[in-house]
């Protein structure tokens, strides 16, 4: 699951972010946004384009960032995620992870409003092309 690899990468490379592979602690999560702590990053996969014969897939990933009542907190994290992932090529995000061919941001951080507690939320979306070998794809 590429979202897990992106979440682990964010936890390692982005200021004030930490990822726990068990999903219990830290503030970076896969497809869930707990009520606390205030500052959270949720990483989710959604749709993508698959080549029927070539061994590559384009996977869409969203990083949704919730900050505090100060909009700059969440924005700064979302912007750092954007800055660090945009344009990344020919690498793996984690050891023994998927081979990333390229990362293309779909947008700069977008303000999606506040949650019920007045905490600002931001999203940034990426299209990530990965090497994806299957039985009929080589």
Residue ranges and their predicted role:
Residues 2, 73, 118:
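Conserved acidic
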Residues 55-72, 120-130:
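Oligomerization/assembly interface segments of phage tail-like spikes and tubes
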């Amino acid at each position: 699951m590429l979202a897990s690899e992106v979440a682990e990468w964010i936890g390692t490379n982005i200021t004030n972010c930490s990822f726990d592979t068990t999903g219990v602690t830290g503030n970076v999560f896969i497809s869930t946004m707990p009520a606390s702590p205030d500052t959270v990053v949720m990483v989710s996969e959604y749709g993508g384009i698959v080549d029927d014969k070539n061994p590559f897939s384009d996977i869409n990933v969203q990083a949704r960032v919730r900050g505090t009542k100060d909009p700059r907190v969440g924005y700064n994290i979302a912007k750092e995620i954007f800055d660090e992932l945009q344009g990344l090529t020919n690498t793996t995000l984690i050891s023994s992870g998927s081979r990333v061919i390229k990362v293309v941001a779909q947008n700069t951080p977008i303000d999606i409003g506040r949650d019920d507690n007045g905490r600002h939320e931001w999203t940034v979306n990426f299209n990530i092309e990965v090497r994806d070998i299957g039985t009929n794809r080589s």
